[in-house]
């Protein structure tokens, strides 16, 4: 049985420089997917310069990169997903519903979304509408 390995993100550590170095030195094709540290959509509907650098396809050439998004707002998730697909060519996006940070959870983001199943259902219904 073959194991599938995914590289989990860690904010401030696993940016494109880390992902590329890890793949070159250790991964060598063994890592199925590398997840980016989360992008947190903003009301301006634009990515920050550091986010653009991290998700730029040229900076992730040759490694299967999945962009992680942290939001509890379906509209923000949808515009982010569209932009990642249309402008950056990503066809897989990951919703962060697991971050246990107190700051994140207090905003009902990350694992905080799991505390409110009805809100999570509403979010997912809107995304997949």
How does the language model describe each region?
Residues 1-5:
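Extreme N-terminal starter segment of soluble prokaryotic enzymes
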Residues 6, 18, 76, 80, ...:
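General structural feature for long, well-ordered alpha-helical segments within catalytic domains
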Residues 56-64, 113-129:
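Alpha-helix-loop-beta-strand connector modules within alpha/beta enzyme cores
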Residues 10, 14, 100, 112:
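Gly/Ser/Thr-rich beta-alpha loop segments that engage phosphate groups in nucleotides
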Residues 10-83, 87-90:
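Glycine-rich, positively charged N-terminal anion/phosphate-binding segment
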Residues 101-116:
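Surface-exposed, active-site-proximal loop segments in enzymatic domains
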Residues 36, 92-101:
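Non-cysteine beta-strand/loop elements that form the S-adenosyl-L-methionine
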């Amino acid at each position: 049985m073959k194991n599938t390995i995914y590289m989990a993100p860690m904010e401030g550590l696993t940016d494109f420089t880390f992902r590329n170095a890890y793949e070159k030195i250790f991964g060598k094709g063994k890592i199925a997917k590398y997840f980016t540290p989360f992008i947190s959509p903003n009301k301006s509907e634009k990515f920050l310069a550091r986010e653009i650098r991290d998700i730029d396809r040229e900076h992730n050439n040759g490694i299967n990169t999945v962009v992680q998004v942290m939001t509890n707002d379906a509209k923000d998730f949808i515009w982010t997903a569209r932009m990642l697909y249309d402008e950056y060519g990503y066809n897989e996006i990951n919703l962060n519903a697991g971050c246990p940070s107190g700051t994140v959870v207090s905003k009902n983001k990350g694992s905080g979304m799991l505390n409110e199943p009805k809100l999570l259902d509403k979010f997912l219904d809107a995304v997949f509408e």
